[in-house]
Amino acid sequence: MVFHLPDSMDYSQGSLVEPLAVAMRAVNLTHFQLSETVAVIGAGTIGLLTILAARMKGAAKIIVSDVNSHRLTMAKKLGADVIINASEADPLSIIRAETGGKGAAAVIEAVGITATANQSLFAVRNGGFVTWIGNSDPDVTINMQQIVTRELTLRGSYGFNQEFEYAIEAVKSGLIDPTILIEQTASLSDGPRIIDDLASGKSDLIKVILNP
């Protein structure tokens, strides 16, 4: 499928339409009401863009948890109301404190490992909605009793559908500006070094644009 980018959009904006569409898909599939609290577990590119999509849908309070302080700083810039460094504090305790002890109305898990998958089940309120968008480990072990006895709704989200068109329009209209995630612009020849630095953990840049 091919989508035409409007002439008013540059390639930097265009490069972030796909991950924004993925984030918008997850939010569209997640049930919460206006003025409710949404928790996002994982502040990678998709998790960060989920902040923008959740706010656009009407989330009143957005809580973001991650172990990377740089990503959490970016989450705050994007509008997260509460950020939690999970390597320094217990996310569940803070989420409960921020929601009057009930838990978030909805939780979007954007990591995809056993620890955070289970964390998402404990972070949501009774009868709440959990969406998994993280896709790191093929097999995870979860606490099934949390789903059954607390009547949780759990679903997965993958890719996008009509959200790609929605993402284009949101960026074109200025409703969402995802380009804040672009932290460096470099030449294509610098690509191998930058990729190696990211893979090794030497760099924690979120998005880099490589120009010919």
Q: Where on the chain are the PLM-derived regions?
A:
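C-terminal hydrophobic helical "lid"/dimerization subdomain
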Residues: 118-122, 161, 165-212
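Conserved acidic E/D residue at the C-terminus of a beta-strand in Rossmann-like folds
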Residues: 66, 134, 158
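Mid-domain Rossmann-like dinucleotide-binding core that forms the NAD(H)/NADP(H) cofactor-binding site
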Residues: 9-88, 93
